[in-house]
């Protein structure tokens, strides 16, 4: 049988506290309240002499230790009693835990007079267990005090086999003061910081100041993080005049004693060669950080440019395709590169006062509208000629050619006008010959689309596109496979991919030093597609208002 007991009980049962004691008898069982009140009254009725006699140490009877004597007469074995003697339990007769018979409150004795014979209970019969009548509690307290520190109550297991008892060790031990003692493994603290070790240092390099593990080259010396921070803090806050030493500056500075004397530690920092002038103040530290950030940004750009330089350039076939597209654009672009010298500004009084209303409700200046329709017809004709000069376009069915031209015509005309934006005069040159301002173009029939074209011109002016780049961008807009009603979608998509690949390789060849130039330029395709979608509805209104200006084929 196993049962949970305290270590004090285990100490008693194993004989660590002295002899053997008797188990508690029937008198130890808690009495009812009425009986306790009667016993209390009887005890109060005792005379003072009787109580003093009980407490006198010199008259105290020696506790009996029961051996193999008879339980009735107390003689040695072999008496004439009817009941044969039997050995008592192993815990009977201990001086540490006496019989509770005759022990009153707080162990001061009961009603039985000192020296009186205590009745003994035979084995197997109910009655009072054998044991001493009275216990010397003063001696027991003295023995317990001399044996060592108080025993900590802890659970044990009493077993019938194997070791007599086994302590159940908890995760942490609770001491008498209520505090916990943690495991030693949880209290381990690293004596030094590992830190980042540069590759230029040996793995076991030591600090020249305290001998701890070094983390780098600080202020012209190989030091640890602690000595580096101590030296920097001392110089920045000017603390060294306040340092003092109680041993006349003769302290030995090592990893253990470095925090005990600041003066000797600072003197050793100076003696090993740490430079005070290398400690930066706030302004110098900010300037240094700014310089570091600038160097990082410069290296990042250099690495980006270096990576762009290794991108593929156009192949021989792509160069031939690029040449054909460029020539097609130059032959159909009015005025060419001399458009600034040959342009004519629209009179300022034209397009400033819209009068007539179009079907969508916008006000239109009829004079400006008439001027714009005059240059629209040759502009559309040049876009058609550009498409016919492309070898891949002529191989498509006639139905697909018409759909592609209707979809891209306004986009290409807007692109050609946007690349001729003049930031000085804030004008766009239409068809290479007429320079107009924002309000004139808006009141001439384009409405809010004019704002989008002018904004596109401002953004494209920063790209500084050449004729080849404009020509390839027009070819990409022309070969859009997402137009509604196309028959040879796969063939058109393949043509657009070939133009895009040649365009990208050309950008890598010419603009490799500009980060993200290719991706930013492709974003302008979406802007042009949006302008073209809104343009189509505007030209339908122009056809209704001026049916004689545009032929059905041109619309």
From Swiss-Prot:
Identify the keywords attached in UniProt to this record, alphabetized. Answer: DNA-binding, Hormone, Metal-binding, Oncogene, Receptor, Repressor, Thyroid hormone, Transcription, Transcription regulation, Virion, Zinc, Zinc-finger
- The highest taxon in the source lineage is Viruses
Q: Which GO terms describe its biological process?
A: negative regulation of transcription by RNA polymerase II; positive regulation of transcription by RNA polymerase II; retinoic acid receptor signaling pathway; thyroid hormone receptor signaling pathway; viral process
Q: Where is this region: Disordered?
A: 14-60, 95-132
Further information: THRA, the cellular counterpart of v-ErbA, is a thyroid hormone receptor alpha.
What is the protein's known function? Acts as a thyroid-hormone receptor antagonist. The v-ErbA oncogene cooperates with v-ErbB and other primarily sarcoma-inducing oncogenes in transformation of erythroblasts. It is non transforming by itself and cannot induce self-renewal of erythroblasts. Instead it blocks the residual capacity of the v-ErbB cells to differentiate terminally.
The name of this protein is Gag polyprotein
Species this chain originates from? Avian erythroblastosis virus (strain ES4)
